[in-house]
Each structure stands twice: as structure tokens, then as C-alpha cells.
Amino acid sequence: MKRTTIKLLFGLALLAGWLGGAAAQDVEASDMVRGGLQVIQLVDQGKTGELWDGAAPAAKKRVARADFMAQISKLRGPLGMPLQRTWVAINRQVVADSDADLAGQYVSVEYETRFTNTAANRASMRELVSFHMDRDGIWRFSGYVLR
């Protein structure tokens, strides 16, 4: 557990180093794609609790740690492991909200993924990983959606 936490913190520190302090329009797409893959690899490995621990305050306000872990497990478990994953889009958005933790810049990276247990491995799913630039100027994980 301690080793996993250290790896997660190191990965998040690398992500923060790549992305920290930059305005959304200045963020390199390749950095966001790499950061998104780091997040998804934690999901692949079942390390969603550790992922939630390093998430943006806005994400933690929306869902409790146990609920986040249960929701991801319920969605991903039946699909099996990924066979192929390709990023397909990066979206940027500025959100105005009276809650300072929710307001601000968001970047989402969308991946097309085929899993071992999906209709003869032919059907692909979309995974969306979102990041929020927190008030301290550091990009942090803020969401994972599977559709």
C-alpha cells in the first residue's frame, strides 16, 4: 500500500509538473494525454481509492471515496482488461460557479477503448478523464466516465 501510494504521488507530481501553472490554452495536448493514461492505468489496476485520494477538491465534493470506488468497479469489472486504447479528443472548458472549488478550467481527454469482455472484443467504449486546475495552479484528476 505504501509503495502504491508513493507511486501515485510520484505520478501526480509528474502530472502537476507537466501541467501546473499553465493556463488551459497553454497546456500541451500530449501532456494531457499522458496524464489521462496515468489515471486510466490506475483504474485498470483497481487503484481507484488512491486515485480519489489525489483528486481535486471539486471531485471529492461530488462523490465519497467509497462510492467512487464502488461505481468504477461496477462499471469496469464486467468489461475485463483493455485490449486497445487510443485517445480521440481533448476538450477544454471554463466553468463559472459560485463555489471556488468547482469554478475554473477543466480539460478532458477522451479515449476509445476495446476491452476483453465486450462483444467478441469488437465493440469499443469511450473513457473520459477530466482534470481541474485547482486554485493553487495545479491540474488534478476530477472525473472518470465510461460510456
What are these regions (language model features)?
Residues 48-49, 138:
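Internal amphipathic alpha-helical segments of the cytochrome P450 catalytic fold
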Residues 33-34, 49-108:
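Short solvent-exposed beta->alpha transition segments
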Residues 1-10:
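Bacterial N-terminal signal peptides that target proteins for export
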Residues 2-3, 19-45:
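Short, low-complexity N-terminal intrinsically disordered segments enriched in polar/charged residues
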